Amino acid sequence: MTFLASQPGCVQSLQPAAVPTDLCTSLARCPKHMRDGPCGGIAPDGSCEADAALTCPFLAALAALPWRNPCVPAGRPPPRSAGRLEAALRAGSFVVIAEAYTPDSADLSGLVARYAALAPYVTAVNIAEHALASPHAATLAAAALLERAGVETIVNMTCRDRNRIAAQGDLLGAAAVGVKNVFCVTGDHPCRGDDRGARGVYDLDSFGLIRLARQLCDTERLVGGRRLETPPRLFVGAAANPFSPPYEVQAERVAAKVVAGADFIQTQAVFDLPALGAFIDQLHAFKALDRAWLIVGVAIITSLEQARWLQRDVPGARVPDALVDRLATIPAQRQRAYGLDYTLELIQRLRLTPGVSGVLLFPLHGDIDSLAELVPRLEPER
């Protein structure tokens, strides 16, 4: 078994590592073959997203995980890219990022037009890759077209859909078309999508992909040792799900991703601000936010149906019962206005929360109109 080396300052390459027996057992049982598990898809009862009858095997092997007790290097890293997102974060601005989902279409002109219209109000557009493990138009193609239209993008890359050979090519290709930011995730298991016969790759997990991105940028070499003629300059992001089990190690896991090379962290949708505050305190204890920036996910709920879906189907969302109950009392034609006002207030509270550097706005069920209605009402970046 091999892991990508994670020591600060080391040459980040594939090196053999001894794996404790209990961790080997967990690796063998994990449907995603996680090397640095557990993933963010664990249900509240501890069951695996790929098999409800399987308790996540990593829950019994937490002490043996290679990323425990991370030592985050002091201070911010040197500038990574020439992008607007990194510049805004370094300047202390509160950034606004809009989530985009590519369509089931070979024509991306509509997507480009809609998000280009949002560009004056957002710092960047985060392009999801095959969301919920269902196929859509290629993320890199959408990014190339949006960058050409003057919209800064964050390209999502999942380990589900590529091995390390393809990952290296895609990282180089992203930089070649003007992408400054990448977001490295393990990816939902294919069983969550609409083609359950598909097989996930999972040659790497999110930790491995983060290290791989940093290796290409910092050592200017591919994993096999070949020197790059022109290395990429990428601002590397990682995911956090603060309210997914095992709760007690989520902040530590984020800190370990920062050690691996993550420059910014984007969370799943958050509603519980007191719990978020406790999570941020834990991140500070690990000094993770001394080096990386935290961007909090905000779901734009515009209907009772959306609220119930989030509450039922999205691990860690913690949609307040009070919000669901309130929407249930509001006529359908007024739920949208209420939801937008609720979201705006939530963003304003996050802006005042120490440790939060921005928000990632999720339009639910393809409702791009909700973004268009919301972002002009936000305070400008400052």
Regions found by a protein language model. Give the residues of each.
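Hydrophobic faces of well-ordered beta-strands that scaffold small-molecule active sites
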Residues: 96-101, 123-127, 153-157, 182-184, ...
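Short, acidic/polar
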Residues: 105-118, 138-139, 164-171, 246-257, ...
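Catalytic cores of alpha/beta
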Residues: 164-176, 248-255, 278-281, 302-309, ...
